[in-house]
């Protein structure tokens, strides 16, 4: 479990927006500390926005999302919620304030129309390299990106890495990119992630709707 998506919410903070607190699975989660963190922000601002990775865990390795919220429906059946619901219930009980827990879940995977031009170009580049290498008879390898600087700007190219080096291996956010308090990321993460969201593609439309892709099944020869 890695917190790249949740950490990316910090990019908006560069412009005075974004969450007040960010919690990632790269650090151990502490519920009493979380409550105090929220109380501290709320006392100063009168509101608090928190971004949480679904993989956060306690020091003993147990996932916070595995906790049960002791809440029942009209029939007495236990209502099980996601991580946001669990944390929202905790804050509601501790602070007696209005709380809303929003589970992005699949929604964050349905926003391809919001992908940056950089993301689209690199995805195409990786797919092209994969097909070319497969046709060339190369296997047991995975396409990887190699970042660099070209003419003073971010640049990226593909390379092959042995599959055994990356299979079932998580690429976690370096601890040095997370602030000491464990409630956000620092400039090192921003410098890493910001180039990846550059560029706004001109998306084709049809009747003001995105022109949905319809792929043909063509066998490679």
Question: What kind of feature is each model-predicted range?
Answer:
Residues 67-221:
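C-terminal non-catalytic interaction/assembly regions of soluble proteins
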Residues 1-100:
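Accessory alpha-helical/coil subdomains and C-terminal extensions
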């Amino acid at each position: 479990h890695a917190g790249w998506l949740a950490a990316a919410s910090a990019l908006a903070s560069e412009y005075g927006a974004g969450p007040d607190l960010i919690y990632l699975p790269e650090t151990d989660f502490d519920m009493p500390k979380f409550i105090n963190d929220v109380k501290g922000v709320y006392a100063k601002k009168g509101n608090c926005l928190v971004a949480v990775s679904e993989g956060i865990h306690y020091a003993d390795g147990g996932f916070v999302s595995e906790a049960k919220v002791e809440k029942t429906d009209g029939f007495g059946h236990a209502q099980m919620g996601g991580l946001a619901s669990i944390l929202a219930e905790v804050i509601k009980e501790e602070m007696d304030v209005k709380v809303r827990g929003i589970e992005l879940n699949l929604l964050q995977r349905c926003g391809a129309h919001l992908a940056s031009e950089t993301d689209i170009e690199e995805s195409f580049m990786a797919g092209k390299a994969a097909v070319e290498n497969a046709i060339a008879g190369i296997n047991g390898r995975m396409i990887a990106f190699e970042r660099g600087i070209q003419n003073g700007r971010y640049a990226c190219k593909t390379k092959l890495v042995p599959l055994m080096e990356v299979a079932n291996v998580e690429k976690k956010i370096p601890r040095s990119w997370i602030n000491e308090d464990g409630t956000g990321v620092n400039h090192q993460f921003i410098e890493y992630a910001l180039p990846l969201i550059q560029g706004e593609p001109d998306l084709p439309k049809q009747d003001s709707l995105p022109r949905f892709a319809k792929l043909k099944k063509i066998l490679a020869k």
